[in-house]
Amino acid sequence: ANAVKLTTNVFRDLNIAFVNELALIFEKAGIDIMTVLEAAKTKYNFQVHYPSAGVGGPCLPVNSYQMINFAKNFTSKTFELVENGRKINEKMPYHTVNLLEDALNEINKPLSGSSILVLGVSYKPDVKDIQISPIEKIIDILKEKGANILIYDPYFKNSEVFGIKTLDDFVQNLGILDGLIIGTAHKEFHNIDPEFLKSKMKNPIVIDSKNIIDQHLAKKAGLIYRGIGRGKI
């Protein structure tokens, strides 16, 4: 039974790693990965996975390392495929912050001293759970780089997460923001209006790690928008 669980979860982790690395390549090539995936999933045997800022939760990351350690009992070689998948998924928080820095460069603003709002800290949508959330790594990187960090998550209002007191409402704070990172695809965030963000934010930079905003509407609204695997618009 444990072998079955490890196999299914490591399979998912590897598929996410594949699409994350594909996203990094497509960004440089100017190809929108979401357009590609929407077309690819029309093929009956294609199992769609989506790129993001990383993989979290109590199962997938842990199970991949369990599989790596299990394999060491039977071979002198490392389980390179699984190890490389973990490396890819674990570098996605860094890439997310790189996208933010790239967007800030457009307005000649350093990340240090910038006010950045992180929307969503749960490792998956519509749950109150931050176990091994990749958003924690994003926040750690932002701290290291001297950003002023604000957090809003509808499941963690007026609490403390990752050493930061969370907001009970994010709209009233938009006017001080130099950037915004969508970290979790909570249903509440799917209805965010790009034009509203443009009208309220001090600097309208949006890093959409879940690709939930229509990038064409973002461009039309005048946002400085970056998605995972979407390139510049």
Residue ranges, per PLM feature:
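Structural/interface elements that position substrates and couple domains in central-metabolism enzymes
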Residues: A1-I233
